[in-house]
Structure formats: structure tokens, C-alpha cells
Amino acid sequence: MNVLVINSGSSSIKYQLIDMTTEKALCSGLVERIGEGMGKLTHKIKPDTDAEEKIVLEQAFANHVEGMKKVVDLITDADKGVIADKGEIYAVGHRVLLGGEEIKQSVKIDEWAKGIIRDYIPLGPLHNPANLAGIEVAEELFPHAPSVGVFDTEFHQTMPKKAYLYPLPYDLYKTLRIRRYGFHGTSHRYITKKTAEFLGKPLDELNIITCHLGNGCSMAAVKNGRCVDTTMGITPLEGLMMGTRCGDIDPALVPFLMEKKGWSGAEIDTVMNKQSGLKGICGMNDMRDIHAAREKGDEMAELAFQMFVYRIRKYIGSFAVVVGKLDAIVFTAGIGENDDLVRAAVCKDMDILGIDIDEAVNAKRSGQARHIGKPGQRVPVLVVPTNEELEIAQTTVAVLNGKN
């Protein structure tokens, strides 16, 4: 049984074809610069294995349909294909940003679901239209294969009202659905399940803090296996300092910047989403570049690093109180899985929480879930690799089998 996972962006399609009998990717890839002149398709056969083979094509893709048609050509190619024909695709799982309160769990896509995704375009103007485009492409090219929407906000639907409401006039919530939704939910859910397995603890008894740290960053407080709070809000801008996003700020800065700089709301949104965070402080948004600059004595790179770490530490303290008895703190995603310097700085001097990491163990690289704390520490610190595509594929199968 093969499931095609699609993450459709405004000018891109990220995809992965997964064999659900082995839960391994047969192929994966990225179509870029759709509708922008010369496009690019990077296709990997047997990705992340010793037998990986990469194919790179440069050609124009007028729209998402053209891009996906080329992907189909590659995956069914007589010589390099991984399946004989597209009929071998059982289902298509879609990453969807925002389903609001109406869609509380993953659903088989129908006209009602598409209508809800469309209704939330004002709150997800970049992602929801692109997600719809991906769904429509799948419906056109794979009419035999049902589509399932797996929502970024789904895992956070268990937050209590006291956590997800903003202290604004309540009528704004009722009329405009202004509330905290949270994102990266697919990753947080996958990590929560994997942590329960790793610790040998029932999911409904698990209390953890998950730290998804990449170019985009978020954390979740998980109590009894359910999300009770998260750092992102009505958009992915709230919360931690990120690669190019500012995270938490005083909202009064918006009218202040309008007055002092003459910026429009759209211009301020661009600054806060694309020119702030690590990039705004030191001009770099890749943590590897920041570490290299720190080693050379770059004070702004050091400041950006310290600010990034400080926000994470502050939220760990906050969420520890929310969760109560902690079973683990879990790091995942690009920085969380691979950057021992960030993990060490985050966990430094956290005796009050019973955290004490082993520097030598922390510095070792591994693609497996692992402990990085010293033996006997009160709260384990774990690194657990995420796999959002597999989570989407597994959820897709569960939905179609009526088990979600």
C-alpha cells in the first residue's frame, strides 16, 4: 500500500511516496518556482539511504498540475520509476495549515472540508490557498485515490479555552474566530507518540514538553498525552524567536511603527515574518552560520544565539508549571535534532527542574531516539527525530480505515 504525501506551497510542491508495509519512502522530492519562469524539480529515489539516487530537472511549470504531472512521470518511469503506474497510489495525504474549530481532526477531503479550508484563507492567506491547490491537483491526477487532510492545528485542539483565548473582547472570538490555534501539530503529535514508545509509558499518562526547533520553532506542553498549550498563536508568528520570525512582541509596536516609519500593515507583517528573528539581529537565519560567526567573535551572532536560547528556556519554565510532573523534555526538527550547542545552552543550569545533560552524549550524532541526560537525572532529556511525512501517511490510512 503506497501513500503519496503532498505539502503544497504557493509556488512549490514537496512530496514523498511511502510504502506503508515498510513505512519507508520510495521517493521524495520538491518542485520549486511554479509559475515563476524557470522551475526546478529535485527528485530522490530511496531517499536517506546508501542507495539514494537524485535527479534534478530544470524546466518551466506553469501551474501545480504541470509540476505534479512531471512528478508522476518520474515515479512511474520505465527505467527509474518506483511504481508501475499511478494506480498503485492508494491515497493522498495533504498537509493543511488551518482548519479552524470546525475541523478538529484529520478528515477525508470532500466539498465540506474544502469549504472550511477556503473559509480560513483570511487567517492563512499564504498556506490555505496553496493547500487547496494541492488537493485539487490530487483530485485531477489521482481520481481513484481518496485525499485526506492532516491539519497543522489538529494536535492543539485539546487546549483548554483558558489557554487558547486571547484576552480581547470576547465578541472578536465569536465573530472573527480570533484565538490561538498553534502549528507544527503533526510533528508534535508524532514526537509525543514516539516518546511514549521510547519511554515505555502509556500515551494517556505521558507529560512532556516538546521542542520543535528549525527555521520555524514551536513548543508544546503535553499533559496525559494531550496538548494543553503551545507557543504559536493565531498565526505561526507568535512564541519563540525563529529564523526570520520575531516571536512574542508587544502588539503596541504595530501602531508605533506605522506612525514612526510610515509602514503599512502588510509591510510590518513582512518585517516581522521575514526580516526578524535571528536574521533581524545578526543578518543570518541559519544556526550553522551563526555558530561559525560566534567562533570568530561576532558579537551580534552571539547575541542572536543567546536571545534564541533564552526564549526556549523561558517557555520550558512556563510549560513545566502547566504540565506538572514532567516525564521528559524532547528536542526535535533540524536544530533540535542536530545542534548540540543549542541543546546544551538551553539545558544549562536547570537543576531546579532536575535537568542535567551529559555533554559527551549530547555531542554525538544519531538518527535514533536517545537520552542525552546524565544517568539518574530527575527529568530525562531526549532527542527524538521527527517524521511529519510518515505521520501524515499513517493518519491518512487511519482516517480511511475509520480509526483516527
Curated annotation (Swiss-Prot):
Gene Ontology molecular function: acetate kinase activity; ATP binding; magnesium ion binding
Catalytic-site annotation from UniProt: D152
Cofactor details (free text): Mg(2+). Can also accept Mn(2+).
Keyword Transferase assigned: yes
Chain positions recorded as ATP binding sites: K14, H212, L213, G214, N215, G216, D286, M287, R288, G334, I335, G336, E337, N338
Listed InterPro entries: Ac/propionate_kinase (IPR004372), Aliphatic_acid_kin_short-chain (IPR000890), Aliphatic_acid_kinase_CS (IPR023865), ATPase_NBD (IPR043129)
Cellular compartment(s): Cytoplasm
Pathway involvement of the protein, from the record: Metabolic intermediate biosynthesis; acetyl-CoA biosynthesis; acetyl-CoA from acetate: step 1/2
A GO biological process held by the record: acetyl-CoA biosynthetic process
Keyword Cytoplasm on entry: yes
Catalysed reactions listed for this entry: acetate + ATP = acetyl phosphate + ADP
Pfam families: Acetate_kinase
GO cellular component: cytoplasm
Matching PANTHER family: ACETATE KINASE, ACETATE KINASE-RELATED
Recorded family membership: Belongs to the acetokinase family.
Function: Catalyzes the formation of acetyl phosphate from acetate and ATP. Can also catalyze the reverse reaction.
Name of protein: Acetate kinase
The species this protein was found in: Nitratidesulfovibrio vulgaris (strain DSM 19637 / Miyazaki F) (Desulfovibrio vulgaris)
